[in-house]
Amino acid sequence: TAKIRLVTTDIAEALDGAEVVYFTAPSYGQKAFFDLAVPALSDGQVIVLMPGNYGTLALKAALREAGKDVLVAETDNLPYACAATEPGVVNVRGVKKAVTLAAFPAGDYAAVEAAVDGAFCTGWRKGENVLATSMSGVNMVVHCAPMLANAGRIESEGGHFEFYYAGMTPAVCRLIEATDRERLAVARAYGLDLVSTAQTFRNQYGVEGETLYDVLQANPAFAGFAPKTLHHRFLTEDTPYSM
């Protein structure tokens, strides 16, 4: 445990003296954060986007333009399966065994890993590069297609069902797996050898199962959640910023 030294809306005050900065807002908030943070960052700091969703590419360009010597990294996902339920309240449903971390450029990985070591209870898995980590973020696969497949249920039931269980039937999971095969094919075209969404969840949560459907049904971290509306980050973030 640790005491929170400062809570502030002043970004310059928050960044002053920080060795490592973790940015955990949705992808559609990245640019606004970069615009505010880059002028306040200091040489030698480390900034980690959690997750990256290709944001490190834009951040590195902004830092280069500003003449800042800051280490940049990203993860493929958050260390926790969690969601904000109301202002000031977060429901953490599970903790991942490991998330993938990559630096940009990739050669900075050792310095980044040393800076973030021990910061979270989860482990770090070394990513080949930030393209690999961004394409390993499987939210675009496991969220977008099921949102469309469950559109009627989301609108009629307003979140009162199990999205990852009842909403991801064998047929819906086959649709997810078809989308996943496209993701893996695009990755191979870039020379990347990524694992399937099912294997990603096996690695992250330690669950077992032959198919994606089996893996989802066996994961207690996915219990008790469903979007209440189609205007949800599963579509507004995962479709334009990942897919």
Task: Tell what function each PLM region has.
Residues 79, 84-179:
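Substrate/ligand-engaging "lid" and interaction regions
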Residues 200-207, 213-243:
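Long, low-complexity C-terminal extensions of enzymes
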Residues 15-21, 42-44:
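Short acidic/histidine-rich motifs immediately flanking catalytic phosphotransfer sites
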Residues 1-18:
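Conserved N-terminal Rossmann-fold NAD(P) cofactor-binding segment
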Residues 172, 179-219:
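Small-residue-rich helix-loop
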Residues 27-88:
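Rossmann-like NAD(P)(H) cofactor-binding subdomain of soluble oxidoreductases
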Residues 17, 23-26, 50, 119:
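Short, well-ordered coil/turn residues at beta-beta hairpins
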